[in-house]
Amino acid sequence: MSYINLPTVLPSSPSKTRGQIQVILGPMFSGKSTELMRRVRRFQIAQYKCLVIKYAKDTRYSNSFSTHDRNTMDALPACMLRDVTQESLGVAVIGIDEGQFFPDIVDFCEMMANEGKTVIVAALDGTFQRKAFGSILNLVPLAESVVKLTAVCMECFREAAYTKRLGLEKEVEVIGGADKYHSVCRLCYFKKSSAQTAGSDNKNCLVLGQPGEALVVRKLFASQQVLQYNSAN
């Protein structure tokens, strides 16, 4: 029997780690941050030097980034990714949470991947209006790996691909959790929430702005009419 002896390091082996971009998309509550954390920890176990970057305006968890079930990991806050370029060049793996909020996400990820870094981005793909969120979708053609996760619809328990805002705010960037957003399916996306229904009802109230005030006034007038009737008799 003959054996083939292969060298431990092949001549064609790269001299440094090859860079790549991995993108994790999906609605809120679909497990994007959990998957980002899992991938980063996998590299940490293999003794790679890792850095996680979080959006600085999300101050809910101090200097950590957190999943919705309160698993946390140390993170470097930033509003612009270019502000943490030096820190990023000193590591092998870069994790970016809430990538949709960073206006320079595309240029930064491409630059770091070309420097041999593994860049893992977790981001919302769409706004509460189901429109592209910032420039995050421009990262898709540049990425080696793209996955879109789904959540469970918080109104009917089917598969959920969208994020629905519960309040009446119109601006795109409103940071919050289950108090402000639901993950929903296509059918439930078009159903009005209780807050939206209350808001539309208030617009139709010509005299009094608060629900229930008209009922109080009617009771008040009824009491006055009874008093007038009793005094007349």
Curated annotation (Swiss-Prot):
Post-translational modification N-acetylserine, affected residues: 2
Enzyme active site: 98 (proton acceptor)
Enzyme class: transferase
One GO cellular component term noted in the UniProt record for this chain: nucleus
Pfam family, one: TK
Annotated positions binding Zn(2+): 153, 156, 185, 188
Key word Zinc present: yes
Binding locations of ATP: 26-33, 58-60, 97-100
Residue positions binding substrate: 128, 172-176, 181
Post-translational events: Phosphorylated on Ser-13 in mitosis. Phosphorylation of Ser-13 by CDK1 during mitosis reduces homotetramerization and catalytic efficiency when DNA replication is complete and intracellular TK1 is still present at a high level.
Reaction(s) this enzyme catalyzes, per UniProt: thymidine + ATP = dTMP + ADP + H(+)
Subunit structure: Homotetramer. Tetramerization from dimerization is induced by ATP and increases catalytic efficiency due to a high affinity for thymidine. Tetramerization is inhibited by phosphorylation at Ser-13. Interacts (via the KEN box) with FZR1.
Name recorded for this polypeptide: Thymidine kinase, cytosolic
Species, as recorded: Mus musculus (Mouse)
Gene that produces this protein: Tk1
